[in-house]
């Protein structure tokens, strides 16, 4: 995304008819890039199974939560910040 940041900013500028390139780079591109870096650094921890307390009625069982991929996700994004509002939910 960083390699294509200038092209993204130009496309958003063309769509809006004069949006500031710096605003697009800071408010959209860099925000998504930083969110992706944050998620990438924590992905192993988030994806590993973890133990959770079992209800008293079911003891002595052990309970755990095992995260699974979501699969295909549809995102409906508003128009005001198209890159950020479309990609941040995918990163989260």
Task: Indicate where each model-derived feature is located.
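Conserved small-residue-rich beta-alpha loop and adjacent elements
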Residues: 53-92
